[in-house]
Amino acid sequence: MTRLTLALDVMGGDFGPSVTVPAALQALNSNSQLTLLLVGNPDAITPLLAKADFEQRSRLQIIPAQSVIASDARPSQAIRASRGSSMRMTLELVKEGRAQACVSAGNTGALMGLAKLLLKPLEGIERPALVTVLPHQQKGKTVVLDLGANVDCDSTMLVQFAIMGSVLAEEVVEIPNPRVALLNIGEEEVKGLDSIRDASAVLKTIPSINYIGYLEANELLTGKTDVLVCDGFTGNVTLKTMEGVVRMFLSLLKSQGEGKKRSWWLLLLKRWLQKSLTRRFSHLNPDQYNGACLLGLRGTVIKSHGAANQRAFAVAIEQAVQAVQRQVPQRIAARLESVYPAGFELLDGGKSGTLR
């Protein structure tokens, strides 16, 4: 594997450097070819590097930043006042070619806006989408987008998301001829918003997309599709609901039920079941799939969950490594060119799309 350099916004997220810096060291331990640029306040970063050995320090560089974009800041205001912030400087390192990708757990709206401003969308893409790869009950994986970058999406954007998701499924998840579905309130053709029905009509006309129709939310983890496309509002609510249910389920498995008198054999049986079920469903733990790629840009940007712990942020770093190694932006650009050889034209005020 060739050497690669990532830029980390270590000040972002709910816990800042106390999580991101140890996660960076963990990532260095796992990948001997990795170099990390830690962007943030040196006074907050340096003490957390006390346990780093000489070899790790040789692959670390602190890039001082003057400020941090607050997680509750309005994106428009945050972008206007972003110069010198850890988030903006992290993206600028990618733009300048000093880093091949970046990772941030900061303000999602600000990250989306700054990434679009600095790195620019690929030709043929209106707006980037947040995408993640979720495990399903068949022990496979499903690519899901958009997860919150775009609250409102017209049919053109949904079609573009489908193309990008299909490329990601093939190139990163290594699923040949991935099945693509639109998230909807029913499987019938007449169900759903106009934007969803119009996107469905366009997807049926694209030979390179293995479009299978609509999928309902209760089938998200069944493995019935390899790529699931939706608008950012729906995707964000769906993902967080699923994560909450999974965390509650795993928490219940670990509960010991203190204060309840039970026979020794019932306690033994319970502990055996806890260990067995925890192992069986551990792949659904949200920490293991943290890191949503901001897909559709000319560079690689990974958005970590703001509440990520050390393990989860390290997973987000690994997501960035994989995206760089698989050359995801370049492959999406190539697919768009093959699907839309003469460009993409919006019709009906953006309510539908067609090839020309």
UniProtKB/Swiss-Prot annotation:
GO terms for cellular component: cytoplasm. It comes from Shigella boydii serotype 18 (strain CDC 3083-94 / BS512). Belongs to the PlsX family. HAMAP family: PlsX (MF_00019). Pathway: Lipid metabolism; phospholipid metabolism. The keyword Lipid metabolism applies. Its main location: cytoplasm. Homodimer. Probably interacts with PlsY. Its EC number is 2.3.1.274. GO terms for biological process: fatty acid biosynthetic process; phospholipid biosynthetic process. GO terms for molecular function: phosphate:acyl-[acyl carrier protein] acyltransferase activity. This is Phosphate acyltransferase. It catalyses: a fatty acyl-[ACP] + phosphate = an acyl phosphate + holo-[ACP]. InterPro entries: FA_synthesis, Phospholipid_synth_PlsX-like. It comes from the Bacteria. It is found in: Cytoplasm. It is an enzyme of class 2 (transferase). The keyword Plastid does not apply. Catalyzes the reversible formation of acyl-phosphate (acyl-PO(4)) from acyl-[acyl-carrier-protein] (acyl-ACP). This enzyme utilizes acyl-ACP as fatty acyl donor, but not acyl-CoA. Keywords: Cytoplasm, Lipid biosynthesis, Lipid metabolism, Phospholipid biosynthesis, Phospholipid metabolism, Transferase.
